[in-house]
Structures are given as C-alpha cells and as structure tokens.
C-alpha cells in the first residue's frame, strides 16, 4: 500500500487485485483460502489462574506480542510473499497467519505446543526470510524479525537440533513405557 502523495499526478496509477488469490471480477478476489487456513489455528489455551484469581505476566512479554495485534488483515504481506505467489506452495500459510500463530505461541499464558503444526501444517520452513512482507506492512510490524525468525528458531531447536533429539530419545516417557519400564515390580 502506498500513499497517494508519493505518485506523480501526470502518470497513470495501476490498481490490480491481489495476485495470490483467485480473481472473481474487477478488483474482487476469493479470500476463502484465508479463512480455511485460519480455521486450522488452534485458539489460545491459557494456564489456569493462580489461587488468588490472577494471571501473572511480565510487561515485556505483553509488549512483545502487542505488535502482532496491530495487523489489520490487509493481506499485502500474503500478496507480496513470493513463496505463496510464485511458487504456490499449498503447505505454506504465509506471513499473515505466521503472525497470528506467533501472537499465540509467544503469549505468556499459552500452554499449547504449536511447533509440530508450524512445521507440518503451516510450512514455516518454506519461508526464506526475504523480508518483503515486512517492507509492505502498513502497520510497520516487523513480521520477519519479530515473528517468523523466532518461530523458525524454535522449530529448528525442537526438530533439527541433534543434542535435543538425543535428549528426547533418552528421556522419552512413551519410548520407556513401550519397553516396559513403567511397570512396578
């Protein structure tokens, strides 16, 4: 999105529909794909309240995710994302929904582990961090730096770190119970 003041009035201005979405008519596109992706995102599951009825959070944790809530869902980031537009990878949710998942995954009260979904369902590995989504964001959200990169780091640590894999394989309760170690003799 651009301000009208940056254009010269003696040149024609080209307006076109969002390229990624199926074209219906004129500037109208079919946005149903966005709603389908959104339905796959599990909602926030907060930790239970403490005995005094409160939920304690650090202010810095709250401020970190508030940036993500500025999104107005204009889908310009989805339109400019070359993974969605050019490669048409169906397994990639796109920057808008990675922002939404980041707002949930980084919420101080969320109890769900969203890493497997990020990897398998939403295809975070397809993002090659070109920052084109950040450049077009009308709300100046640092999509790549504050959401996508931290999520990719979490996924990499959980699934591709050899030391973490070794630790999980040695301490996995499910593997131990399959071997009969959970039985009391």
Can you say where each PLM-predicted feature lies in the sequence?
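Hydrophobic/aromatic-rich structural module bridging two neighboring secondary-structure elements via a short loop
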Residues: 1-19
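Ferredoxin-type iron-sulfur electron-transfer modules in oxidoreductases and energy-metabolism complexes
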Residues: 13-185
């Amino acid at each position: 999105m651009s301000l009208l003041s940056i254009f010269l009035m003696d040149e024609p201005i080209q307006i076109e529909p969002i390229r990624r979405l199926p074209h219906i008519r004129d500037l109208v596109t079919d946005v149903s794909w966005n709603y389908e992706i959104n339905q796959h995102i599990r909602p926030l599951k907060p930790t239970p309240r403490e005995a005094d009825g409160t939920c304690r959070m650090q202010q810095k944790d709250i401020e970190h995710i508030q940036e993500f809530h500025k999104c107005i869902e204009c889908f310009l980031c989805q339109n400019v994302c070359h993974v969605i537009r050019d490669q048409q990878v169906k397994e990639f949710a796109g920057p808008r929904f990675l922002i939404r998942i980041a707002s949930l995954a980084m919420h101080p009260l969320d109890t769900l582990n969203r890493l497997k979904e990020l990897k398998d369902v939403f295809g975070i590995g397809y993002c090659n961090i070109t920052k084109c989504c950040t450049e077009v964001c009308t709300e100046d959200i640092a999509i790549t730096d504050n959401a996508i990169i931290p999520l990719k780091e979490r996924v990499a640590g959980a699934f591709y770190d050899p030391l973490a894999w070794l630790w999980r394989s040695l301490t996995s309760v499910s593997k131990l119970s399959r071997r009969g170690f959970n039985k009391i003799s």
